[in-house]
């Protein structure tokens, strides 16, 4: 047993996760009724979600409390990259619609009872209210906008505190980071449970009826990850971006694919940024912020599903209108939050541009939930890996200039 544990610990985390994926799929096909196996996945995601708000709060406050006047970060560049990357992804989805137009079986889709935003104004209102949420409530409800805002406020306020107080905050950040490392080391078992749960509940053939929609969604997201993002990175860095792109997809995207939550993947991304040697003054803020506003995958989902509904209803859409849709979906995607399935509930906002009733729009959302097993996983992988990619690109572009 000791030899096995020793060999297991020497194996890289990615290989251990791959083993967990294979075992989870096999168990899901052979013994789907042993649902207790899926509890491993629920506990893993629950653990990440539980510690992530505290981690963000502690690390951001600690980082800002240690900064001095004149220190530089790349936050302005990172935010511009986040917004431009999301818009580029939305525009890519529009182009894919013209190349591969698809329609939906709206009558067969089950409507969801979840409440969707009534417009872009409501999305902005929610974001503003999240900023001034009670800090304790923000931590307990994983409101990352609120957590981030209050962490920044406390961090700046503590810049004038005594060194003893700053050291206490630094210790809290270190302890929280260690707990996160322990949880991440359990990823192979957690992902085993997540894969088992997906296969045992849905089987491998449940998505056959929606194969074309899945192909367009996944194909567009793949194009963004392997073509659009590398182009942006190359323009900014002036060198081959693919080693960095593949590193982000491997170390961040794979984990995010199975957790289906950008929020739960924050600890993984923070560790990757540290491994890449990035400036903590930047990434301790940009990563949790990215889990909320950097939503390239969400923009793709919103545009593809909305334009599929438009095609189904026979509504003619010129490119100028589709361009406006890209702007709307970019803004709306910023409110998707880092929660599994969040982008689907913003589809009615985009559908409203074309006069599509809320009832029909919610049927489109129902289709989204049907294909969500794959769509949401790919969307989260793109969103989360891009958080690290653009943070690294912003810093490396500054290195090029200096």
From Swiss-Prot:
Which ranges form a coiled coil? none
Its localization reads: Cell membrane
Look up keyword Transcription and say if it applies. no
Name the domain of life: Bacteria
Q: Which GO terms describe its biological process?
A: serine transport; threonine transport
Q: How does it sit in the membrane?
A: Multi-pass membrane protein
Q: Name one GO cellular component term.
A: plasma membrane
Catalyzed reactions: L-serine(in) + Na(+)(in) = L-serine(out) + Na(+)(out); L-threonine(in) + Na(+)(in) = L-threonine(out) + Na(+)(out)
Main location group: membrane
Could you list this entry's UniProt keywords, alphabetically sorted: Amino-acid transport, Cell membrane, Membrane, Symport, Transmembrane, Transmembrane helix, Transport
Instruction: Give yes or no: UniProt keyword Amino-acid biosynthesis.
Output: no
Residue ranges annotated as transmembrane are 17-37, 44-64, 79-99, 138-158, 179-199, 212-232, 295-315, 336-356
UniProt-listed InterPro entries: Na-dicarboxylate_symporter, Na:dicarbo_symporter_sf, Ser_Thr_transp_SstT
GO MF annotations in UniProt: neutral L-amino acid:sodium symporter activity
Which family is this sequence assigned to? Belongs to the dicarboxylate/amino acid:cation symporter (DAACS) (TC 2.A.23) family.
Q: Which HAMAP family match?
A: Ser_Thr_transp_SstT
- What does this protein's UniProt record list under function? Involved in the import of serine and threonine into the cell, with the concomitant import of sodium (symport system).
Q: Which PANTHER family match?
A: PROTON/GLUTAMATE-ASPARTATE SYMPORTER, SERINE_THREONINE TRANSPORTER SSTT
**Name of this chain's protein:** Serine/threonine transporter SstT
Question: Which organism encodes this protein?
Answer: Streptococcus thermophilus (strain ATCC BAA-491 / LMD-9)
Name of the gene encoding the protein in the UniProt record? sstT
């Amino acid at each position: 047993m000791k030899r096995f544990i020793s060999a297991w610990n020497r194996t890289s985390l990615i290989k251990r996760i791959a083993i967990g994926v294979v075992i989870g799929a096999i168990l899901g096909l052979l013994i789907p009724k042993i649902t207790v196996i899926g509890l491993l996945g629920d506990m893993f995601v629950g653990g990440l979600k539980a510690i992530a708000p505290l981690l963000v709060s502690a690390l951001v406050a600690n980082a800002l409390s240690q900064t001095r006047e004149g220190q530089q970060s790349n936050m302005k560049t990172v935010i511009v990259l986040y917004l431009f990357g999301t818009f580029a992804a939305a525009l890519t989805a529009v182009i894919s619609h013209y190349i591969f137009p698809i329609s939906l079986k709206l009558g067969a889709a089950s409507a969801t009872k979840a409440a969707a935003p009534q417009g872009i104004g409501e999305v902005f209102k929610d974001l503003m209210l999240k900023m001034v949420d009670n800090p304790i409530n923000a931590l307990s409800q994983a409101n990352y906008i609120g957590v981030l805002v209050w962490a920044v406020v406390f961090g700046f306020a503590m810049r004038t505190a005594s060194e003893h107080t700053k050291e206490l905050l630094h210790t809290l950040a270190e302890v929280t980071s260690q707990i996160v490392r322990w949880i991440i080391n359990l990823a192979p078992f957690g992902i085993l449970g997540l894969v088992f749960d997906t296969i045992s509940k849905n089987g491998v053939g449940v998505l056959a009826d929606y194969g074309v929609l899945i192909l367009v969604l996944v194909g567009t997201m793949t194009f963004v990850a392997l073509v659009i993002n590398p182009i942006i990175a190359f323009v900014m860095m002036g060198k081959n971006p693919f080693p960095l792109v593949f590193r982000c997809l491997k170390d961040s995207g794979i984990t995010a694919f199975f957790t289906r939550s950008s929020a739960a993947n924050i600890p993984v991304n923070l560790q990757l940024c540290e491994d890449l040697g990035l400036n903590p003054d930047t990434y301790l803020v940009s990563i949790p912020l990215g889990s909320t506003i950097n939503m390239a995958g969400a923009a793709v989902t919103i545009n593809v599903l909305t334009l599929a509904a438009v095609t189904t209803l026979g509504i003619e859409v010129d490119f100028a209108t589709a361009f406006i849709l890209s702007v709307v979906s970019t803004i709306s995607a910023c409110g998707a939050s880092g929660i599994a399935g969040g982008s689907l509930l913003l589809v009615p906002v985009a559908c409203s541009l074309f006069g599509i009733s809320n009832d029909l729009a919610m049927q489109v959302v129902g289709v989204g939930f049907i294909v969500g097993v794959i769509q949401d996983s790919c969307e989260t992988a793109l969103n989360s890996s891009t958080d690290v990619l653009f943070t690294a690109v912003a810093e490396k572009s500054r290195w090029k200039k200096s």
